[in-house]
């Protein structure tokens, strides 16, 4: 939609499920102004598929600028933490891409913003565009983004970023934390509690069809419905977000910090009439 509004002529390359390098070669002509490759960061095509990497396209692009939209914009190798490969910004730049675009939030873990990195030649042209004044982010966003990027520079702090911390926490660590929260909730009237294994989805338009093994506190309310309890928790001044599975509430420990345990215990007691 953005490209169409710019009045650029878009020429699709290949088919939905299979694209070959020759498709790019056949599509390039004297009117081609740039090549855009968009990473499927929020969906996945399964089955009979084939795609062309950015590094392969770089070998045939000539003097044309190669643009890659990564979507999520991850800066660490997620394969080290049991997830499937997700191309990093650094990999994209190293592959020969001239301009890389990605989000400041999502997997990066910062404020909502669009980030553009690339060769000075093209970044300079982008800076001269008159739309820059209308689309640039404010000083608060810049300050928040700078803080997050400094956390990536200091490797000891990278895993303090909430998004990264949640995605990379080990199953064993979550299991231990689940036991602690369970002990604080155990014996609560009007509910049956269990620790169950579950699977977390990253969501937010990132890592489609990838599930991370986790532990959850399963709450089976006896005097109110699971839907009513879920609504009550969600509408608190500090909302507690849960999900319902087989008419039971699940509190996924992957998304809960230890300092939030007491809040959860107190609010549950309040809704169930124990406070």
Q: Could you tell me what each predicted segment is?
A:
Residues 1-152, 186, 267:
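Conserved PLP-enzyme active-site core in the AAT-like
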Residues 222-275:
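PLP-dependent enzyme catalytic core of the Aspartate aminotransferase-like
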Residues 121-127, 154-163, 208-213, 247:
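Short acidic (Asp/Glu) and glycine-rich catalytic loops that position anionic groups and cofactors
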Residues 136-184:
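C-terminal catalytic subdomain
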């Amino acid at each position: 939609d953005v490209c169409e509004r710019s009045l650029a002529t878009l020429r699709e390359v290949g088919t939905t499920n299979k694209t070959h390098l020759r498709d790019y070669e056949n599509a390039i002509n004297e009117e081609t102004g740039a090549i855009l490759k968009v990473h499927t960061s929020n969906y996945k095509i399964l089955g009979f598929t084939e795609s062309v990497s950015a590094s392969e396209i770089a070998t045939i692009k000539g003097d044309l600028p190669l643009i890659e939209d990564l979507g999520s914009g991850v800066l660490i190798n997620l394969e080290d933490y049991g997830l499937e490969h997700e191309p990093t910004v650094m990999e994209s730049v190293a592959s020969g891409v001239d301009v890389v675009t990605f989000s400041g939030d999502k997997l990066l873990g910062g404020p909502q913003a669009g980030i553009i990195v690339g060769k000075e030649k093209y970044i300079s042209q982008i800076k001269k565009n008159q739309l820059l004044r209308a689309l640039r982010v404010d000083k608060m966003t810049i300050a928040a983004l700078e803080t997050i990027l400094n956390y990536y520079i200091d490797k000891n702090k990278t895993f303090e970023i909430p998004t990264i911390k949640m995605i990379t926490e080990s199953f064993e660590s979550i299991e231990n934390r689940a036991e602690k929260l369970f002990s604080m909730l155990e014996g609560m009237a009007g509910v049956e509690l269990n620790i169950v294994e579950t699977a977390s989805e990253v969501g937010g338009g990132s890592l489609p069809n990838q599930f991370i093994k986790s532990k959850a506190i399963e709450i089976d309310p006896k005097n109110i419905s699971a839907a009513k309890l879920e609504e009550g928790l969600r509408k608190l001044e500090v909302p507690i977000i849960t999900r319902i599975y087989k008419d039971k509430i699940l509190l996924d420990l992957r998304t809960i910090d230890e300092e939030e345990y007491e809040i959860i215990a107190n609010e549950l007691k309040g809704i169930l009439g124990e406070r």
